[in-house]
Amino acid sequence: MKVEALDKFWADKSRYDLAEKRFYEGPQKVTDRSHYSPLVSEIAKAREHIQNSLEKIDGVTLDDGLNSELAKRLAQLEGEHKELKTQVSLLNELLTATVKRLETQLKLTNGVSKEPEVEAKKPEANDDDDDVDLFGSDSEEEDGEAARIREERLAAYAAKKAKKVQIIAKSNIILDVKPWDDETDLKVMETEIRKITQDGLLWGASKFVPVAFGIQKLSISCVVEDDKVSIDWLTEEIEKLEDFVQSVDIAAFNKI
């Protein structure tokens, strides 16, 4: 009897009881933890929102406000496109007209031809006519007519050139003439200077200008023709008046 009782003894019962307890308590703990975890609820909301967004995109559902905004934008882009096409067309027309105008001007510039030179035809000598020039009288008349026309043109050109007014280059000069001392008579010195004459020289106004220590200088103006009177010659002529003149300076020089 004792041996049978020992054979029926379950030594691992406690381990099986613990496993059974864990099996039944596991789902309950997971359910309770979901109630108290905010992260799980946020994930569920995010999944729901993503699912709704995907359904809207698949169905191409847009709001009325968005549709009207897109329509306005498309209309604005179409208007700008038409305006750009119009401006490009106008620019092309303007460019074409400019090119045509330039081509016309180039043709006119390059198309100016000189007067054709009329060459008198010389009759060819015919050996069969024994060197008889049958058109000799006509050629002589043509040569005489050409010579007359040439003479008339030369005469007309000469007359036109003679009538043309030639521009004479002139200069207005102011000279400062300094005497030796205060005892020099400036009036006499001026008289002697004005005695210098030359074709193309015209004396002008004059005045006495104080220098220092009671000494004065003569400032006199004159107009000279550049082709006829040299400035160096004029100053040398004035300096030849050694009894009165110490030096001559050019105070002003202007072209007329």
UniProtKB/Swiss-Prot annotation:
Alphabetized SUPFAM superfamilies for the sequence: eEF-1beta-like (SSF54984)
Region Disordered: start-end pairs: 110-146
Composition bias, Acidic residues: 126-144
Highest taxon in the source lineage: Eukaryota
Biological function: EF-1-beta and EF-1-delta stimulate the exchange of GDP bound to EF-1-alpha to GTP.
Organism of origin: Drosophila melanogaster
Name of this protein: Probable elongation factor 1-delta
UniProt KW Phosphoprotein keyword: yes
Key words, A-Z: Elongation factor, Phosphoprotein, Protein biosynthesis
GO cellular component: cytosol; eukaryotic translation elongation factor 1 complex
Protein family according to the UniProt entry: Belongs to the EF-1-beta/EF-1-delta family.
Basic and acidic residues bias locations: 114-125
CDD domains hit by this protein: EF1B
InterPro entries, A to Z: eEF-1beta-like_sf (IPR036219), EF-1_beta_acid_region_euk (IPR018940), EF1B_bsu/dsu (IPR049720), EF1B_bsu/dsu_GNE (IPR014038), Transl_elong_EF1B/ribsomal_bS6 (IPR014717), Transl_elong_EF1B_B/D_CS (IPR001326)
Gene Ontology MF terms: guanyl-nucleotide exchange factor activity; translation elongation factor activity
One GO BP: translational elongation
Oligomeric and partner information: EF-1 is composed of 4 subunits: alpha, beta, delta, and gamma.
Modified residues (Phosphoserine): 37, 53, 89, 137, 139
SMART domains associated with the record: EF-1_beta_acid, EF1_GNE
